[in-house]
């Protein structure tokens, strides 16, 4: 069987050209670098941006940085378990988001200072001889053909440089030149109000979390950040301008809402931001792919702009690596848009809902919000639902590189207050919510839609990351034993035992890891396995609990840690053939 076309020799300067050295471009370059892919990153600025933007990084993003081999360095610049609390104008807390679980190996909510993490990503590229960064080089033009893309860059002196690559990834921000030159629509809206953001040193408050003060007179945010930094954000009210609020006397007046003496505050910088909610109509145009803010932008209220971009990088990296190495046909890249676009839309909706709750458009709406939220907060299951951040739409891929028909067949798990949300007409509240939820673009519609029953099958969802141990005494998080590879993991049995030669050769050719999990105590007397199979002990009992909830004992995990399929030990060869099909990868070398 002939190898896919992308495996043919060429005179390309790189396999992948990345436009934009923000967090998405740098993360993608690091991950591709670890996979041995030749990468050029072009950034129009002379240096990576050094002013803070995002302040929240979630467990999924930290897991991505772990996969890139940089999590140890990043931990020095994060505050884990960073809760978010919402207060009425009178100072009464009406909601608290404080998830305390770590199913993916990391705290679910974390504060960080983005430039410090961006610098780690930038310096991380020095590990790879085949990765090059061109700072001060702006994209001037590009074209594509059946074999690749040709791009012309200009440096600060106007000197042009032409590059050839197999694929181009545009991570060049919300004002993406690539997206505009492709004439890809960027649908959505821009909020009319702006926010002035003030960062200060030597935290004048010292409280450890993020407080959202929902005062309709002027909503504001107070967020504790690592290294004694604090961020304040104040809404720019109608009739005010950035120039007015930036004057020392007016800024001091704003700061008196939060500190006793503004003159004693150690200011770092202040900037004004406008909140946008937009989604690209396409994430892929042949050999060009959009990622991060070039593909989607959203309000900051749940910190998901940065994290959505990191999800893009994680999803796209392993697929690009397979394609440029000739392990899969280019059709695999269609799954990037299939898997990421709908979830990006969901995160935009969540961010808009959070913004509507935080800063409603009228005093009357604020009073209704306070009354409703305080009432809901008095119901323990509802309070727990928000505290554990279960309202956050977790990625679940319905199509793409997933095999849903091999799942457990379970029909779903109901939310703690699913009865309240029953739209069948069995309760008055259910009938009311049902009517309001018909308009999913409304506040209530989006909220109800996000709280409804979710399917329980793990296929298409991120796999857990517990701590495991090996017989030789090594202990750590599961991903550290897998690397940037596929993983076939089984509970209590050798996952390769039931595989025929063709299936086994397929996974070995892709570098997949075979792992057998068992109770940690059984590591003292493990039964034999086939060569190359790693046996790990389930130190926390979480793998046992996970498999107990499934009807199958073998899980196929993708390099981005999402569950691709479930199987019984006797189905692994058949499932492998199905996996080869959805991966657009030949079974035979």
Curated annotation (Swiss-Prot):
Where is FAD bound in this sequence? Answer: 15-44, 283-293
What domain of life does the native source organism fall in?
A: Bacteria
Ordered alphabetically, the record's keywords are: Aromatic hydrocarbons catabolism, FAD, Flavoprotein, NAD, Oxidoreductase
Q: Does the keyword Ribosomal protein apply?
A: no
Q: Which InterPro entries match?
A: 3-HPP/3HCI_hydroxylase, FAD-bd, FAD/NAD-bd_sf, PheA/TfdB_FAD_monoxygenase
Q: Which Pfam families would you find in this protein's record?
A: FAD_binding_3
MF terms per GO, please?
3-(3-hydroxyphenyl)propionate hydroxylase activity; FAD binding
Which prosthetic group or cofactor does it need?
FAD
Instruction: Quote the catalytic activity from the record.
Output: 3-(3-hydroxyphenyl)propanoate + NADH + O2 + H(+) = 3-(2,3-dihydroxyphenyl)propanoate + NAD(+) + H2O; (2E)-3-(3-hydroxyphenyl)prop-2-enoate + NADH + O2 + H(+) = (2E)-3-(2,3-dihydroxyphenyl)prop-2-enoate + NAD(+) + H2O
Please name the GO terms of the biological process aspect recorded for this protein, alphabetically. 3-(3-hydroxy)phenylpropionate catabolic process; 3-phenylpropionate catabolic process
Pathway in which this enzyme or protein is active: Aromatic compound metabolism; 3-phenylpropanoate degradation
Give the E.C. number(s): 1.14.13.127
User: NCBIfam families given for it?
Assistant: PRK06183.1-3
Role: Catalyzes the insertion of one atom of molecular oxygen into position 2 of the phenyl ring of 3-(3-hydroxyphenyl)propionate (3-HPP) and hydroxycinnamic acid (3HCI).
Q: Which family does it belong to?
A: Belongs to the PheA/TfdB FAD monooxygenase family.
Q: Mind telling me what this protein is named?
A: 3-(3-hydroxy-phenyl)propionate/3-hydroxycinnamic acid hydroxylase
């Amino acid at each position: 069987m002939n190898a896919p076309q992308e495996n043919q020799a060429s005179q390309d300067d790189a396999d992948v050209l990345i436009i934009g050295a923000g967090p998405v471009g740098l993360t993608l370059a690091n991950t591709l670098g670890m996979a041995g892919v030749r990468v050029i990153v072009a950034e129009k600025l002379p240096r990576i941006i050094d002013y803070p933007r995002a302040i929240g990084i979630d467990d999924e993003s930290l897991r991505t940085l772990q996969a890139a081999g940089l999590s140890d360095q990043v931990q020095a610049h994060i505050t884990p378990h960073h809760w978010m609390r919402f207060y009425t104008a009178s100072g009464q807390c009406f909601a608290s988001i404080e998830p305390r679980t770590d199913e993916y190996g990391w705290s679910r909510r974390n504060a960080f200072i983005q430039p410090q993490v961006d610098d780690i990503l930038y310096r991380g590229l020095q590990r790879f001889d085949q990765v090059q960064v061109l700072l001060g080089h702006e994209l001037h033009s590009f074209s594509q053909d059946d074999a690749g893309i040709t791009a012309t860059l200009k440096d600060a002196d106007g000197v042009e440089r032409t590059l050839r690559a197999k694929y181009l990834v545009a991570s060049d921000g919300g004002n993406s030149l690539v997206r505009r030159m492709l004439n890809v629509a960027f649908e959505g809206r821009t909020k009319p109000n702006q926010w002035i953001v003030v960062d200060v040193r030597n935290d004048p408050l010292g409280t450890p979390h993020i407080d959202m003060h929902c005062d309709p007179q002027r909503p504001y945010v107070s967020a504790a950040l690592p290294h004694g930094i604090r961020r304040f954000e104040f809404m720019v009210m109608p009739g005010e301008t950035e120039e007015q609020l930036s004057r020392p006397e007016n800024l001091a007046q704003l700061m008196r809402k939060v500190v006793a003496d503004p003159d004693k505050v150690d200011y770092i910088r202040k900037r004004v931001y406008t909140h946008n909610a937009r989604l690209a109509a396409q994430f892929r145009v042949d050999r060009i792919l959009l990622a991060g803010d070039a593909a989607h932008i959203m309000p900051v209220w749940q910190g998901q702009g940065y994290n959505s971009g990191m999800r893009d990088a994680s999803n796209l990296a392993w697929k690009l690596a397979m394609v440029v190495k000739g392990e899969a046909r280019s059709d695999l890249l269609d799954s990037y848009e299939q898997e990421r676009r709908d979830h990006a839309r969901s995160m935009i909706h969540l961010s808009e809902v959070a913004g509507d709750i935080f800063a409603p458009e009228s005093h009357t709406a604020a009073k209704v919000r306070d009354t409703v939220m305080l009432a809901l907060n008095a119901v323990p299951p509802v309070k727990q639902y928000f505290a554990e951040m279960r309202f956050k739409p977790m990625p679940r891929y319905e199509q793409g590189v997933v095999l849903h028909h091999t799942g457990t067949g379970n029909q779903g798990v109901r939310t703690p207050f699913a009865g309240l949300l029953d739209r069948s007409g069995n309760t008055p509240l259910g009938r009311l919510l049902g009517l309001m939820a018909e308009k999913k673009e409304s506040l209530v519609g989006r909220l109800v839609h996000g709280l409804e029953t979710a399917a329980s099958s793990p296929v298409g969802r991120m796999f857990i990351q517990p701590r495991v141990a090996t017989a030789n005494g090594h202990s750590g998080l599961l991903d550290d034993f897998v690397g940037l590879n596929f993983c076939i993991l089984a509970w209590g049995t050798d996952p390769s035992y039931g595989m025929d030669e063709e299936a086994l050769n397929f996974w070995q050719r892709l570098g997949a890891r075979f792992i057998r999990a068992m109770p940690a105590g059984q590591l003292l007397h493990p039964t034999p396995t086939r060569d190359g199979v790693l046996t790990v002990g389930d130190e926390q009992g979480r793998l046992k609990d996970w498999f107990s909830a499934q009807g199958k004992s073998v899980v196929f995990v993708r390099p981005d840690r999402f569950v691709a399929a479930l199987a019984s030990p006797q189905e692994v060869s058949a499932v492998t053939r199905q996996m080869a099909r959805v991966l657009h990868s030949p079974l035979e070398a």
